[in-house]
Structures are given as C-alpha cells and as structure tokens.
C-alpha cells in the first residue's frame, strides 16, 4: 500500500516543483519620485527571455503602462538571465506593482513624499549608539572611560585616567574610533548644512523626547563634536580609539565593561604616529595625518554651523587649527589597534583627509576675510594646499578595483573634492570635478555589464561603499548639472532598499512595510528584541570572503539560500557579522544620502514666519524682484536691460510710487512689457519691532488698510491696459514694506486671500540701497560676489530664488548695483537658469 501512495504522490510532487518560482522582479521598496529615475530588475533562474512587462495600479487593478525590454544582461550571481525594466517616463503618483508573466513585484509608491522622514528615521540608530547617556535605554554606560596607552611621547604615563565619556559605539560592539566618529560627524553636519529643511526637531539634546529649537541632526552632530573635543583635549594630545577588540569577548547590552583589567575603565589609544599593537603583530601606522585631519575638518565645519553658540564656536575654531597642526607632526596614517585578533581599521590613505582639512579650515579664514582682508591670502594658500593633496589622490583607490582591505581607503569617497570644488573659481575646479567623473566612469565600466548596475566591490561593508558612491554621483551631478550618471546613482540607491538579488532592504525597519533585516548581528535585537531602527547593515560580501572569515556560524536556516552565489553572499542572521552588522558611520553617510533624496523630491516652497521665501529648489528657475517706494532712477535702465535680455521680472511698489504722476510712464511701460506688478503696501509702514519680531507696531485694521489700499489702484492700472496677463495676480502676492513681518502679518494676509512673500536669504542683493555712510554699506562688487558665491557654493544654487533688488537707491548712493544687472543676467543664463515672474515661479507647485 505504501508503494502505491508514493507512486500516487509523485505526479503531485513533480507538479509542485515545476511551479516553484523561477523569476522575480526587484524594486526599491521605498518607492520612486515622479520625475526621478525608475528602474526595476527582472531576474530568472532559467535561461529565457521576456519581451514586455506591465505596470499595474493596485487600487484600480488596471494596467497603466506597458514597457518593452531592452537588451538582455545575461547571468548575474544566482540568476541565468536578467533585464532592466525602465519606467522613468511614467510619472503619475500612486501605488503600483510590476508584472511579467508569473512574476510580480512587491507593491511600491510613486510620489513626491516617498523619501520623506527617512533621514530622520535613521537618526534613531545614531541616538541608540550613544555612549555615556543612552537615550534609548534611558540609562548611562561606559562612564569610567578611560586610561591612556601609548602617550609617553606627550608625557602621559600609561594608565593615566582621562575623561573621554560620550560619543557613539562604532557598531554592534562598543569600540569607539576617532576616524569613524569624525567622519560621521562631518556627514551629519553636511546634511544639515546642505538640506536644513529636511530635518525636524522632535528630540532634546540628550536624545529624549521634546523639542529644543534645534534640528535633531544638528543635536546629533554636536554629540559627536563634544566627544571629539574630549579626544583632543590639549594642543599636543589626541586620541585615536577607545576600547579594543577585547570588547568582543561577549555580547551584552551596553553598561560597564570589565574586560580590560582596570575595573570599568577602557583604554584610550594615543595618536602617536608610531606602530601600535595588532593582535600578535603590529599595525602599519606611519603618521598622525589621517586621524588629526578628520578632527580638523569636523571642528571647522562645526564652527560654521554653531556660530550662534559663540563660546562653543570659538572653541571649535581653535581646535580646528590645532588639529590641523597635529596632522603635520608626522605625515602618514594612524591605524587602529587590537589585542586578540588581527582585525583592525587598516587605513592606508591620508592625503584625502588633509585635502578636506585644508579646505574646511580655509573656509574659516574665508569667513574671517569679510572683516579681515589679511585672511584672504591665508584662504588662498589653504585652498592651494588642498588642491595639491587632491592631485596626489585624484580617485579613491577602491573605486574601479575588485577588492580592498577592511577600511583601507577611508572615508569611502573623497569628501575634499566636493568641498574644494565648491570654493574654487578657476580651472582647478574643473580639474577636481574631473577626478569625480573619472572615478564614476571606472565604476560604470563594470556596472554597465550587469542588470543591477553593480560596479562596487563586495568587500566588507560594501553597503557603506555603495552609499558613498551614490553620494559621489550626486555631488558630481550637483557640481556640474550633468545627469549622465543619474541612472547609475539611482541604481546604487535602489540597491540599498531592495533592488538587489535578495530583494531586501539593507536598513533595519525601512521601509516599515518591506522586507528588511530582522535578525542583525546586534546585542539589542539578539538579547532583548529591541529594534535598531535606521541602522544600515554591512551588506553582501564575496563568497570567498565569507568562507574565509573566523567564527561565523548561522543560527537559523538561510531564507535567502537560493539567491546566494560566489559573486555575493548576504544573510539576515545574527551569526553573520560580515554582512548583517550595522555600523554607525555607514548610517551617518546614509543619512546624508537620504536627506539629498528627500530634498530633490520635495519640489515645494520654503517658508519663514508664514511667508514664501523661495520657490522650488529642485528647479533651475529664478525670479528677479525689484521693490520701489521713493526712488526710481534705475527704472529705465532696468526696463531696457530686461527687454534686451528678453526676460520678465517682478516689480513691487508702494502707494506713494503707484500714485506718483512722474512714475506713471515707467509703470505703464513695465506692465505693457509683461512684467509683474505687485503690492508693496499702501503707506510703507513698519509692522513689527526690529529687535522683538513678535511685537506688532500696528493693529489689524491699520495693517489691512495698508494691505488692501492698493487693490483699487492696481485694478485701475489693469483696466487702463486692457487687463494684461502680467497683472492677473498682482493683488494676490504681497511683499511687505522693509521686507519685515511676523507670523501675525502673514496670517492676516492669508485671512484676506493674499499670499505674503519675501526675498530668499543668503545673498546681499537686498543691500543695494545702502550708502557709504551706513554701517551696513555694501558695495556693488561685494553684493555681486555674494550672489555668485552663493550660486557656486550651495548644492541647489539659486534654484527657486526670489532675488530682491531696488529700482532706485537715491542720490546718496552713487555705486548703483543695477548697473551690474546685464552681467548678472548673462552669468545666470550661462548657468542655465530660466527667468520667471513671481507668479510664474510660485505657480509651479
């Protein structure tokens, strides 16, 4: 009987096997933006082809788009055939999935907000990694750190106690490294500098719930800076790491460690520039530069971003200088130390660190040069030093290579190239940007041969490399406007969130609905089932690396077994520390990348006190705005310039201006030419106190009289000129007198159907009325350079700018800025900007 049962079951078993899934569609589980690159990857275990595929609306269950496949990419890893499915031309927001035959992708969203909050989400992991007071545990740990080793050259006896409590634990172990901490701090500072609107304020400085008026990312960066200050307490004292691999003797929730033979103290290793222990051997330390230069860079950028905290800012300024000096004690690398095993951060490059440090410190001198011309020569010298270092390592050595040692080339990309290119104005800028392009081309040469566009090597922490390379592509695009590598950039980003052979996100808990790590190599999850939200895991490694590592043993069955190959191995398993351990510095880099992605996709307006102060910062469009009250001597010149350049601008005048018979001809000329004429108030009143902005100087009714008093006059002008399009929204937008208002004024505008706007801050264009007798006087050259500098030094340039100037400045100012208008317009045109009226710019939303 048993034989018959077996025989009867055989066809069923055979049928089930034939129906096992043979093909998959990999997507970015976070989703895609309407105007962004959108590519999925179809991959199959059988050698077969496909000709077309469909994009299906989840709610309507309707095929919305049918695409034809391009060239087959062939075998990759565990797959015998792969194709790229490009649906970038489909832009309608919604929830969709892709299907090809029997293969169906996970559902995903297309929308402008798909990346919203992702950067802030990853900050959760950074807070959870805090040493000292840990806000996640609501408890303190490692409060006895530490005792000094290798400090004899600086006159520090071995085992001398020093306070270095704080900072971040490096990964799932609790070691702390100056190099990774300084790099993480710099990335967080950059993220806030470049994308301040992305981040929210939901936590206090200690990481607990509550607002403190400071963006959470800035709080986190300051946590890093405070620890770095402890690690460089004196001009001739600097420390490289806290703890060593004796930490690996047991997994535990961070509290106090007694592994080191001195109670609960942990060793803190001095930056000596000399060889230090590496297990049974010695490391290859050659100098002080790599670590000290990272300190200098973080301190310098921190100084710029914490100017309002004068005492802290001045301390960072001082430490940036001493850290840079420390970097030159002995040129070379400072590798980390270990006691029990040979695993260390064996960094081999340092010129990239000095390039960034010289640039960052140069920026401090540049800021000082505004009031101290003597600093200009120092700035130029520092930038030239940085350029010389850039030439020594034009391309980060792992880029284009098949392998590298663990953290051999660190940071994983050259941040100095980006920061230096933002400052240079001559041919050196093109040279430095060219280095980025050469590196990207090296990766592209490998990536274009496979459907995942994978050109990053599968070495330890490959996800960190992937994140950094995507940032390099983004920076190249930002610096040049060249989108040649946008699809490669997006492919690396997509890889991190599911468009990879395993179909999984590499970030714990992101997205919340997706396939993400659940069993990382972490004590928090393994011992207590605590989530480690936002942590970026190390990522896949070559099969050969995985097989050669010490102490790896999976604790559960491998759910990704059918997707493993010699090309790459990844496990969501606590036992695999090579591919599934999150790292603090990798997560900090990802925070920058996610912030960039969110900023790119926002496409919204910027507001201040209820007023719009900037249009869409992702669009290369700008509005020239001229205000007028008493003077108008520049009117004819401005009008003629705009006519010659064939562009339109916006003019906001007061009642005194509009009712002045002497100005009637100019007003009509501007309106007939298609320029926007707007409301700058009836009587040019000051609405609120200069020093106490919340204090109103007018009541609601006097304000409304000032706001609405011009409606009749603007209506008459419109009637007289047969309602030209330029006046169709003239009474809707209101630019307040003195460009000064508060939330109450903006709310009253909204109540009466008006939208308050103001100029975009960042340049000195609005200072073109000042006279040489004024304390705040700015010459036309200084004003012009402030505009050019802002355009060149900020990732979004002047995108969406409301660039405000005055139609006249009166007889006391002889240096008329409007005379620079032709040159300014030509410059902006050459940069690719499109000129729009205020109505045109702000109707884009």
Residue ranges and their predicted role:
Residues 217-237:
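Carboxylate/His-rich catalytic cores and anion/metal-binding grooves
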Residues 185-192, 228-230, 239, 355-356, ...:
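Structural recognition of the beta-strand scaffold that forms the well-ordered cores
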Residues 37-68, 72-77, 332-350, 611-667:
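N-terminal carbohydrate-binding/catalytic regions of secreted carbohydrate-active enzymes
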Residues 206-214:
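Acidic, glycine-anchored loop motifs typical of Ca2+
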Residues 604-694, 709, 713-732, 827, ...:
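Active-site beta->alpha N-cap acidic-glycine motif
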Residues 637, 659-662, 684-804, 808-834, ...:
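Catalytic domains of cell-wall/extracellular-matrix polysaccharide-remodeling enzymes
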Residues 29-101, 106, 112, 127-183, ...:
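Aromatic (Trp/Tyr) and acidic
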């Amino acid at each position: 009987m048993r034989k018959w049962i077996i025989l009867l079951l055989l066809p069923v078993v055979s049928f089930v096997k034939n129906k096992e899934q043979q093909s998959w569609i990999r997507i970015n589980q976070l989703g895609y933006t309407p105007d962004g690159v959108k590519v999925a990857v179809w991959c199959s275990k059988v050698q077969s082809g496909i000709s077309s595929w469909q994009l299906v609306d989840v709610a309507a269950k309707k095929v919305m788009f049918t695409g034809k496949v391009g060239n087959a990419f062939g075998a990759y890893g565990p797959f015998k055939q792969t194709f790229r499915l490009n649906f970038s031309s489909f832009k309608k927001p919604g929830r969709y999935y892709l299907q090809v035959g029997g293969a169906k992708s996970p559902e995903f969203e297309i929308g402008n907000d798909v990346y919203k909050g992702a950067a802030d989400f990853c900050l959760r992991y950074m807070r959870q990694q805090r040493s000292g007071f840990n806000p996640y545990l609501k408890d303190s740990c490692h409060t006895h750190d530490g005792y000094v080793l290798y400090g004899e050259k600086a006159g520090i006896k071995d085992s001398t106690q020093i306070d270095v409590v704080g900072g971040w634990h490096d990964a799932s172990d609790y070691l702390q490294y100056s190099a990774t901490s300084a790099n993480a701090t710099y990335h967080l500072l950059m993220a806030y500098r470049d994308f301040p609107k992305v981040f929210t304020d939901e936590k206090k400085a200690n990481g607990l719930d509550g607002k403190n008026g400071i963006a959470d990312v800035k709080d986190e960066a300051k946590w890093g800076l405070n620890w770095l200050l402890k690690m460089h307490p004196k001009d001739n004292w600097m420390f490289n790491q806290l703890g060593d691999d004796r930490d690996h003797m047991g997994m535990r929730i961070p509290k106090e460690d007694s592994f080191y033979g001195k109670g609960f103290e942990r060793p803190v290793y001095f930056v000596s520039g000399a060889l230090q222990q590496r297990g049974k051997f010695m490391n290859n330390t050659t100098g002080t530069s790599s670590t000290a230069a990272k300190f200098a860079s973080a301190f310098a950028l921190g100084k710029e971003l914490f100017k309002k905290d004068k005492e802290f800012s001045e301390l960072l300024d001082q430490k940036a200088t001493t850290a840079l000096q420390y970097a030159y004690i002995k040129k070379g690398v400072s590798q980390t130390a270990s006691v029990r095993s040979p695993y260390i951060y064996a960094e081999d490059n340092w010129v990239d660190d000095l390039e960034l440090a010289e640039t960052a410190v140069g920026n401090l001198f540049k800021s000082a040069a505004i009031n101290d011309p003597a600093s200009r020569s120092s700035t130029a010298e520092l930038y030239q030093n940085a350029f010389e270092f850039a030439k020594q390592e034009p391309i980060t050595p792992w880029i284009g290579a098949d392998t590298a040692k663990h953290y051999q080339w660190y940071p994983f990309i050259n941040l100095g190239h980006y920061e230096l290119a933002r400052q240079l104005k001559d041919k050196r800028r093109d040279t430095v940007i060219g280095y980025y392009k050469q590196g990207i081309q090296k990766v592209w040469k490998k990536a274009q041969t496979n459907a995942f566009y994978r050109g990053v090597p599968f070495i330890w922490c490959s996800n960190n490399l992937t994140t950094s390379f995507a940032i390099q592509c983004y920076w190249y695009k930002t610096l040049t406007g060249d989108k040649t590598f946008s699809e490669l950039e997006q492919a690396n980003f997509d890889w991190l969130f599911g468009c990879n052979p395993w179909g999984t996100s590499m970030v714990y808990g992101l997205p919340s609905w997706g396939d993400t790590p659940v069993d990382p190599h972490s004590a928090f999850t393994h011992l207590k089932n605590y989530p480690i939200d936002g942590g970026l895991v190390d990522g896949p490694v070559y099969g050969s690396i995985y097989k050669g590592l010490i102490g790896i043993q999976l604790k559960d069955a491998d759910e990704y077994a059918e997707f493993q190959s010699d090309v790459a191995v990844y496990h969501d398993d606590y036992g695999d520390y090579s591919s599934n351990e999150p790292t603090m510095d990798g997560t900090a880099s990802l925070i920058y990348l996610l912030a960039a992605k969110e900023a790119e996709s926002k496409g919204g307006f910027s507001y201040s006190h209820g007023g719009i102060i900037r249009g869409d910062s992702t669009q290369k469009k700008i509005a020239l705005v001229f205000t007028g009250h008493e003077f108008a001597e520049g009117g004819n010149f401005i009008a003629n310039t705009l006519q010659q350049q064939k562009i339109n601008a916006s003019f906001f005048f007061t009642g005194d201006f509009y009712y002045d018979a002497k100005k009637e001809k100019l007003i009509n000329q501007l309106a007939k030419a298609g320029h926007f004429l707007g409301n700058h108030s009836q009587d040019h009143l000051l609405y609120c106190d200069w020093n106490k902005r919340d204090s109103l100087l007018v009541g609601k009714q006097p304000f409304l009289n000032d706001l609405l008093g011009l409606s009749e006059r603007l209506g008459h002008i419109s009637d007289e000129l047969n309602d030209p399009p330029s006046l169709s929204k003239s009474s809707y937008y209101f630019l307040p007198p003195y460009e000064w208002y508060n939330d109450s004024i903006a709310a009253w505008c909204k109540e009466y159907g008006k939208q308050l706007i103001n100029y975009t801050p960042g340049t000195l264009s609005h200072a073109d009325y000042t006279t040489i007798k004024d304390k705040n006087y700015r010459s036309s050259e200084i004003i012009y350079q402030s505009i050019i500098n802002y355009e060149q030094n900020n990732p979004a340039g002047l995108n969406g700018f409301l660039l405000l100037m005055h139609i006249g400045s009166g007889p006391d100012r002889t240096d008329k800025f409007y005379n620079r208008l032709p040159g300014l317009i030509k410059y902006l045109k050459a940069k690719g900007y499109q000129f729009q009226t205020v109505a045109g710019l702000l109707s884009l939303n």
